[in-house]
Amino acid sequence: MTKQKKIISVLTAAALLCTGIGTAGISQPLTASAADSIESSMDWDTLNIAGGGFVSGIITGDDQMYARTDVGGAYRYDYEQKKWVQLMGFLNEADRGFLSVDAMCVDPNDDDTLYLLCGCAYFSGARTAIFRSRDAGETFEEIDVTDLIQVHGNGYGRQCGEAIAVDPDNPDIIYCGGDATAGTSGLIMSEDGGDTWKAVDGYGKLDLFEYEINWPTWTEHKVKTTAEKYDGGANGVSTITITDGKVFVGTSIKGKANLHVAEVGSDDFKPLSEELPTEQMPSRINLDPDGNLLITYINGLMFDSGTGYAYKYNPKTDELKDITPTTTSNGTAKKLNVGYGGVFSDRHDSNKLVATTCAQWYSQSWTADAWDRDAIAWGDRFF
């Protein structure tokens, strides 16, 4: 592939505020002494301009926490200052498509090594790049992978994740998935810490990217993806996890096996389990401290995730357990089969789990005195 790599220094943009001084509408010029007085009495610093967009993912390591957004770049949490720090202020207008961060991961052995998968179908020539930082986002290197995969970080399914992962046993090995591919596979890998990338042809031979579409729609640039149009469900690879020498890859398709596993470095991908659903799509895979996979499913990528499930899979024993949360109605407990955004484990206790629904609209039923006004909160549920 033609690989573009750039070293980028993260600079903070400064905003200069100008204040007019006058009396009764009459402009009065400032003398040198007045200007000196103002300069000495003011504190001058950069203006903090907060980012925007949908926060589509948060990842944590031992010491660092990062967030990604669909149009506002990526952030690192400053625990001392108790604020989020923008990491992508170096991007210019021509590269604004990279503010759509489709996926991210850290090296499990080093929180300061961060990878961001970025791209937007309708900005910056629909280019896709992986940004690598080895200093917690202070500086980045850009590796262009457009000729292998393409992503739309502001597209449907962007809440799924993460579609990039580092092998904890060998951090030079990284797997990354796209929404679309102009090459032979929607899954790529690096064996040199992200310097170079190649297609994983074994995944490509599964023929999960079966539709050929124009990307973007107003061009003649042909790609293969998992849906008939990019703005309705072309989410491609939704989630990747690497553990115990195996790579697990979830794909946003229905009607066939959509969660596959292979030995790291192998092209022999197989369905993980016949017991897993095929009429829903994997949304996220997390690990508990015992090495079990916590897998969640959704039925839609847009504003209603529909039905779904949650599972725990033991890769050592191949045991699969349905851990979908339950609700109680009229004294009877039943599975709440709605779309789930993820199940997360306490880093030190695999028995402590938190599950969250995805794109559901529930009354939270908090008591009125828990809020500033007498109203009911609406949103997703936590278990």
Residue ranges and their predicted role:
Residues 21-22, 281:
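Intrinsic disorder/low-complexity segments in short proteins, especially the signal peptide
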Residues 12-21:
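Hydrophobic core
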